[in-house]
């Protein structure tokens, strides 16, 4: 078990947070967990799917499962650029990269409390939509300051969502993204799902060979979109949480 202190969450959610990261071979140790979480208010545990010892042990000690994280990947050479749905959007979609703080703020202002309705902070009654939004805004701002690429999806001349791109060697990592609330449930998830490949391709990042990102099991609409494009599931992790006030 790896113990990860999360000091940034004090600003994001107002609680001292620790994350317990398990491997598939770890055996649950109650004494070890009690020692690790001392002094923290919000406890998060990530357990590889199949490690029942840690899953049941955490649950018996008051942790509650809130989601499963699905780690997807896709090799660009395996992506179908001639897909029929992509052809329907051809000429209607473009990407606009945020280059300065003013453009970052414009994107932050378009984000609304119910935009991230499948996020675990949003869904947790202790936190709720407003805290979830605050956390996402802080997260995106910090990513932007660290040099992560931030861009919007422009559909028929209107910004309908955003995504991020953190290119590490040949891999496009996608920390976060979403469709703006007013454009949800309109079939535009296809734009978000394909952007992980199309953005680096169309913007000239020739060294990028694949993409990788995590999606919550609570987000069924996007899971359907990624499955439609045959993204590969590389990993699954149970995510459990506990409040200690």
Locate predicted features.
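Conserved N-terminal entry element of GNAT/NAT acetyltransferase domains
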Residues: 1-13, 75-102
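Conserved beta-strand-loop-alpha-helix junction that forms the acyl-donor binding cleft
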Residues: 22-23, 45-53, 180, 211-223, ...
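A short beta-loop-alpha structural element at the N-terminal edge
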Residues: 24, 92-119
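Conserved acetyl-CoA-binding loop-helix of GNAT-fold acetyltransferases
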Residues: 26-36, 179, 185-202, 224, ...
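Conserved GNAT acetyl-CoA-binding A-motif
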Residues: 38-48, 171, 200-215
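Conserved beta-hairpin
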Residues: 47, 147-163
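Conserved active-site alpha-helix within GNAT-family acetyltransferase domains
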Residues: 50-65, 217-235
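Active-site rim helix/loop that mediates acceptor-substrate recognition in acyltransferases
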Residues: 53-54, 127-150
């Amino acid at each position: 078990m790896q113990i990860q202190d999360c000091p940034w969450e004090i600003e994001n959610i107002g609680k001292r947070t620790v994350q317990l990261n398990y491997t598939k071979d770890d055996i649950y140790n109650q004494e070890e967990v009690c020692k690790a979480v001392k002094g923290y208010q919000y406890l998060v545990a990530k357990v590889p799917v199949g490690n029942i010892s840690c899953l049941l042990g955490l649950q018996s000690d008051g942790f509650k499962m809130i989601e499963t994280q699905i780690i997807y990947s896709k090799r660009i050479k395996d992506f179908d650029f001639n897909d029929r749905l992509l052809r329907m959007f051809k000429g209607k979609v473009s990407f606009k990269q945020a280059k300065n703080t003013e453009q970052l703020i414009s994107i932050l202002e378009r984000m609304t409390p119910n935009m991230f309705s499948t996020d675990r902070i949003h869904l947790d009654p202790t936190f709720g939509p407003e805290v979830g939004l605050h956390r996402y805004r802080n997260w995106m701002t910090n990513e932007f300051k660290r040099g992560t690429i931030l861009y919007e999806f422009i559909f028929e001349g209107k910004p309908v969502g955003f995504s991020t791109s953190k290119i590490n060697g040949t891999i496009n990592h996608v920390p976060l993204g979403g469709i703006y609330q007013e454009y949800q449930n309109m079939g535009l998830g296809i734009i978000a799902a394909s952007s992980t490949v199309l953005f680096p391709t169309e913007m000239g990042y020739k060294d990028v060979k694949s993409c990788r990102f995590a999606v919550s099991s609570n987000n069924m609409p996007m899971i359907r979109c990624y499955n439609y494009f045959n993204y590969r599931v590389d990993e699954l992790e149970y995510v459990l949480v506990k409040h200690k006030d």
